[in-house]
């Protein structure tokens, strides 16, 4: 975890102090459960729950000998107690405490992620509504296609982010489970009721069955969902970067007073935040392979997953949280240039209307093949003109002029019918209906 890419609230969940505090919370829940089952006296339960304490230096010192951080933890806590310490960590195994504590930490962390996703969705929605009718050129393969609106671009992003909210709700169900089932998961030394009570105290569900650990397909699902979320965020960031290129310049990240873009070139205004998000997404996705490989543990459990999770889980949550907040800020403060969008539309010389013309000709009795041939032939002529450099008059509709002078077209379409094909409103007539689908 790098301080540079961490928000305080999420970072506070992933440190040694919080980890052991959560261990203690789990151990106290187990003590309370034993007490409710009549196996620990009220006085011992009260002493443990009120007096049990630890300090990190003590744990570190003990771990030098034990080479086992959970045993170092329980030993340290026992030193803060009296005879009642015999009931601390009673009847359970290390993974019962560690995995159940991890469930608590992941649940809290995922709630922060869900909050970040909701914020991003709302920001995308608001900006989409703001630019619902803002005309721009749609691009496929990076090449001009047909007129669309910037609002549609943002609405598409919003709808994708909304799908992640649904996926994360399901993932929350998978990860918010505890396990107090003993060394082999067969409840040999503690009844099922102990697990049920302890998890109830902690606000967790119980798994139907465990071995020594909570099964790692649950963790892998989380990692994959965060990787998918990152890919969607990268998709948004990459498109912003493309639209901010100098020759496009339809949107721009906010550039603050005093900000610098280059140590060598004073004129530079770069999409550095979107570039940063792109890089963070690569980091997030990089954890999916080791987390998937953690699923296949030996028999009832081995330790190969532990080192992976010590890296992966904190970094997955902290980086995802930061990525979401940064992207939300980029979208919220994004500067949009509608005039440049219209200018770029005009740069096609009218070619963006080719399909509209193509679809009118078959209505007049011409075959699709003949229609396509005529329209494409005229379009290719315009490409040749555009290849020679920018035309003198940006408002000049080269494609329209070519069509109006084509004798073959005149047999099927009048001048007014041809001109009617060059109408931007034709391409925006369904925007309202699309928005209704997305946002209502």
Residue ranges and their predicted role:
Residues 283-366, 374:
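Long, amphipathic alpha-helical stalk/connector segments used for oligomerization, subunit docking
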Residues 11-15, 58-60, 259-279, 301-315, ...:
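Short beta-alpha connecting loops at secondary-structure transitions
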Residues 164, 212-305:
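Glycine-rich anion/phosphate-binding loop at the beta-strand->alpha-helix junction
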Residues 1-187, 192-197, 206, 259-262, ...:
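A helix-coil-helix interface module used to build multimeric assemblies
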Residues 32, 105-117, 226-235, 240, ...:
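Alpha-helical support elements that line or immediately flank enzyme active sites
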Residues 30-33, 113, 117-120, 124-127, ...:
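Amphipathic alpha-helices that form helix-helix packing interfaces
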Residues 129-151, 250-261, 267-268, 299-308, ...:
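Glycine-rich cofactor-pocket loops
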Residues 195-212, 216:
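Active-site-adjacent "gating/activation" loops or surface patches in catalytic cores
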């Amino acid at each position: 975890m790098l301080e540079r890419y961490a928000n305080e609230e999420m970072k506070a969940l992933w440190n040694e102090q919080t980890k052991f505090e959560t261990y203690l919370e789990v151990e106290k829940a187990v003590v309370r459960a034993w007490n409710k089952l009549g196996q620990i006296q009220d006085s011992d339960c009260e002493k443990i729950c009120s007096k049990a304490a630890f300090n990190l230096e003590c744990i570190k010192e003990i771990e030098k000998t034990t080479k086992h951080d959970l045993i170092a933890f329980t030993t340290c806590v026992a030193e803060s107690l009296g005879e009642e310490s015999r009931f601390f960590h009673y009847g359970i195994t290390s993974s019962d405490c560690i995995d159940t504590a991890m469930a608590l930490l992941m649940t809290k962390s995922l709630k922060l992620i869900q909050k970040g996703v909701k914020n991003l969705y709302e920001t995308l929605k608001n900006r989409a509504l703001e630019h619902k009718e803002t005309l721009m050129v749609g691009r496929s393969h990076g090449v001009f296609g047909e007129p669309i609106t910037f609002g549609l671009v943002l609405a598409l992003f919003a709808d994708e982010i909304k799908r992640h909210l649904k996926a994360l709700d399901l993932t929350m169900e998978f990860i918010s489970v505890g396990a107090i089932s003993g060394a082999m998961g067969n409840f040999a030394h503690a009844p099922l009721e102990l697990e049920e009570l302890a998890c109830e105290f902690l606000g967790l569900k119980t798994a139907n069955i465990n071995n020594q650990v909570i099964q790692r397909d649950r963790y892998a699902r989380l990692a994959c969902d965060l990787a998918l979320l990152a890919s969607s965020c990268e998709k948004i960031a990459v498109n912003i970067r493309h639209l901010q290129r100098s020759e496009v310049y339809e949107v721009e990240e906010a550039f603050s007073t005093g900000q610098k873009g280059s140590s060598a070139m004073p004129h530079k205004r770069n999409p550095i935040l979107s570039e940063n998000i792109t890089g963070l997404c690569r980091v997030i996705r990089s954890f999916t392979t080791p987390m998937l490989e953690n699923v296949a543990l030996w028999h009832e459990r081995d330790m190969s997953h532990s080192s992976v999770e010590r890296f992966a889980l904190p970094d997955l949550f902290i980086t995802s949280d930061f990525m979401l907040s940064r992207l939300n800020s980029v979208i919220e403060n994004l500067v949009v240039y509608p005039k440049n969008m219209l200018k770029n539309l005009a740069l096609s010389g009218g070619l963006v209307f080719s399909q509209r013309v193509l679809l009118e000709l078959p209505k007049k009795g011409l075959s699709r093949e003949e229609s396509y041939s005529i329209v494409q032939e005229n379009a290719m002529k315009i490409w040749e003109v555009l290849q020679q450099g920018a035309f003198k008059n940006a408002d000049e509709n080269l494609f329209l002029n070519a069509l109006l002078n084509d004798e073959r077209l005149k047999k099927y379409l009048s001048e007014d019918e041809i001109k009617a094909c060059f109408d931007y409103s034709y391409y925006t007539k369904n925007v309202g209906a699309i928005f209704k689908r997305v946002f209502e």
